[in-house]
Amino acid sequence: MAERTGVQDRGQSYDATGAVRVVVQNHLLQVLAVLTMDPPTGVQSEAARDEKVWLLKAVRPIAARDDVRGQYAGYRSVPGVGPDSATESFVAARLYIDSWRWADVPIYLRAGKKMPVTATEVWVEFGKPPRETSGEHVSSASSHMRMRISPDIDIGLGLRVKQPGERMVGKDVELILTRSGIANLPPYQRLLGDALRGIGQLFAREDFVMA
């Protein structure tokens, strides 16, 4: 989850929390749970929320070597931020889920401010086949699914195709499916609408927060 902007006028409140609590806990863990949870047993909101909780309980505690944090240049000069603040504006973490489905599969979470772009994406890298037909080194870009959640919505499927000619040489391409022509509700407007209708699927339950 990358943001081009800094903390702007929220220096004091942001400095008391940081990227882990503001972004990872509130946003990225929700995305992680939706992406990796088992199918819910019913269509009710509580069924999906139950699966999210079980998923988070299976997340292994993150080791110090798998956690990197930092600040963007100029963060400490923001009004409300202490001159010796150690609060992170960037975080990258590697975690594992101790379940049969996700055993030994590394999952990376990254979030930061003052990044080159503003975008929230999920990148799923597929396992490599036991043998490459082209006999050349193939990067992960040739076998992935990329899901952009914001600011726009699209899905990209990474493939490797043969280049024209006699030689067996491939190149990486990405097929993109873009959602267009549909007016998307602003995020908080959707949440408020769900709250008024009693739909709790997108809300964090207490046991989810504690997990």
Which residues does each PLM region occupy?
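Secretory/organelle targeting and membrane-embedding segments
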Residues: 1-211
